[in-house]
Every structure is written in structure tokens, then in C-alpha cells.
């Protein structure tokens, strides 16, 4: 969401929604690799602000037939309509993915969207805090009890016949 245009995302994923008869979700991430941002004229230090602003626009593009919008990170829109429109007027379900950012958990809760905690290398307690924040804010924003909050979890594993082989093969990376 940080290095892509929300208008392009709105139109591309509404089209995909039509092609697959609504059987899709969209998972958005902020990105955590600094060198990628300049390829798109962005600065990783603006990552949170870009994620918040770009998603606010994407959310509006899918819900308003005509959008007048101005922000800090893209050109303004005046009387703009994203096409195609979401299938049956229902935008795709969105997951906000995060490795470490409480702001993204807050954003997911605010909109009533899913929160995907992608555990790459942080301790479990870190993700417990992120998910706890999301659940608390989910309730705060009136979406229901904390246990009804929509949480997804991810992780990585590198497996070999024995742990030493796995360590030796993966260590260079």
C-alpha cells in the first residue's frame, strides 16, 4: 500500500473481484525493505503515513461513486470515479499485514478490517501485544467484542531432516 497508487489498487482489485466472482481477499502491507521505497519515489521514513493515507483513499474509492480527495502523498482527485466498481457494491475484504507496527493494528481496527500478524523473527510476546491492541481497538470502534476481531497469523519455517542441516544450509542467508 505504501509504494503503489491507491487508485490502481482500487481498480485492479475490483476487476479481479469481478473475474473471480468475489472469491478474493486483499492483504496489504507497509513494506519493510528500505531499498524498495526509492524505486517508487518514496521514502521508508514515510511508511506509516503512506499506509494510513493511501488506505484511507482506497477505502473511499471503493465506497463512494464520486471522490474528491486531497492528501500529502499523491495528486488530488476531483470528481473521480474508480472503475470498475466493486462487485455487487461490496468491496473486497481487506487484511492489514504487519510485522511490528501498532499503527497498522490500529488502522485495521478502525476500519473493521482483518489484522494479519506476520511473525518473521520477533518473540511471541510482541505479537500478543499487537493482536491485543487490535482486539481492544476493534471493540473501541464498535465492531464487536474483542474475541470477534478478525486475526490472521503467519510465520516461516526452514526444515531439513535434522536441525543442524537446517542451520548450516540457512545460515548464509
What does each model-identified segment do?
Residues 1-173:
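N-terminal glycine-rich cofactor-binding segment that shapes the pocket for flavin-like pterin cofactors
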